[in-house]
Amino acid sequence: MGNELFADKFIDKQVDNPKAPSSPCDGPGQRFEEVMSDPSNLLIDRCENAGKVIDGNIVCHNNIIVPEKSYYGDFADILTLNKGVHEPAEERMFGEVLNYIPDNGTIIELGSYWAFYSMWFSKEVVNANVYCVEPDSKNMETGKNNCKLNNVEADFTQGRVSNLDGFRPAPNADYNNFNVKDFVEEKNIEFVDILHSDIQGCELVMLNDIVPLLVDKKIRYLFISTHTQELHYSCIELLEQHDYRIIASADFDDETFCFDGIVVACHKDNLDIPYTSLGCRRHTPLRSTCMV
């Protein structure tokens, strides 16, 4: 890569930014400034029409198109302002990881919603096997429509990882328990190249469920969105206990430039990608959206 410490160059300890108070569902607010201030933006290649609205569809940085306002309503405006990027650090690392996925690779996207990462995987991996899991029926329909729009074939399953202590899903959600390990067995999936998870507070429950897969080294890379500071570091601890190393991390309270924290991991024997700093939102000067 060569840019493992790139984001650290922007850190200024004299700056002390509080975390934006709202999630995407509550409106953009300071969230746009944080996303656009992420140094990872500078390392993401953008296609020619990235961020443009063409025939009612927004062009993402990787040439994937999605209907305007299809991602948390007005929050989709970040795709226009930020030239097709909505989660800079995560998208930076996802793009890097894709370089190491072989033909016939498999992705399981938990909490897939609009299926962004699944579609991207499918576009880059020859003969990709794509599995999308989403608890909310309306969100799942959004993902299906996006896949159709981008000529992507994917296997969709409605279900959620159970966690009584987690955040409650939307009214259209399926409350039936979803277990990743059981799913892998039912679908006869021999190896998971990317397990991508954004499951609203149930991430540690999910990781405990897949310990047998971790022990057997059945997962090449994990992308885990974290939803509290405690959960973030508990997820890291569990992964490291089972011989997975952290290749990128931005915690929930201080480091992430997005509302969620992010952990990217692979088995310790996999040395393809060195540890990469994702910077620190709290100590990075924010870029005003009026500068765009």
Enumerate the language-model features and the residues they cover:
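S-adenosyl-L-methionine
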Residues: 1-133, 141-145, 152-155, 185, ...
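Short internal loop-to-helix segment that lines adenine-nucleotide cofactor pockets
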Residues: 81-108, 155-217, 223, 229-230, ...
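Acidic, metal-coordinating catalytic cores used for nucleic-acid/nucleotide bond scission
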Residues: 114, 139, 201, 228
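Glycine-rich, phosphate-binding/catalytic loops in enzymes
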Residues: 124, 149, 211-215, 240-241
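A short, structure-level motif marking secondary-structure boundaries and short turns
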Residues: 128-130, 219-222
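Conserved SAM/SAH-binding beta-strand->alpha-helix loop
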Residues: 136
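A short beta-to-alpha transition loop/helix N-cap that caps and shapes the active-site region
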Residues: 139-142, 165-167
